């Protein structure tokens, strides 16, 4: 079995982004599984505060020594905060992807959109089958 964490309070995309909804603010990042697959992260491109994310669209990219991957929005809303620590030191995402390793905080347009994303159990089944 896998040693990856799948926090129950998150929703997941099959492209390995997660979203944590707290009222009308969503925190977005990538999963521990994604961090493991990427290896050493060397660059992170994130949108600016005030930018609009549209669910399903690309909002940035993450680059490792192995690959460059697009980041996909799990929810629609306006960026209200971005993790500047990760922009400066992207490798830090590996230390705590579900905590201090978040990418963006977004004021959501429709909180119910989060229900379209995978539950922790659905995501676990998806990645453990990969």
Curated annotation (Swiss-Prot):
Its cofactor is (R)-lipoate. The keyword Transport does not apply. Keywords: Lipoyl. The keyword rRNA processing does not apply. Residues 25-107 form the Lipoyl-binding domain. The modification N6-lipoyllysine is found at residue 66. GO terms for cellular component: cytosol; glycine cleavage complex. Binds 1 lipoyl cofactor covalently. InterPro entries: 2-oxoA_DH_lipoyl-BS (IPR003016), Biotin_lipoyl (IPR000089), GCV_H (IPR002930), GCV_H/Fam206 (IPR033753), GCV_H_sub (IPR017453), Single_hybrid_motif (IPR011053). Pfam families: GCV_H. SUPFAM superfamilies: Single hybrid motif. GO terms for biological process: glycine decarboxylation via glycine cleavage system. It comes from the Bacteria. CDD domains: GCS_H. NCBIfam families: gcvH, PRK01202.1. The glycine cleavage system is composed of four proteins: P, T, L and H. Belongs to the GcvH family. The glycine cleavage system catalyzes the degradation of glycine. The H protein shuttles the methylamine group of glycine from the P protein to the T protein. This is Glycine cleavage system H protein. The gene is gcvH.
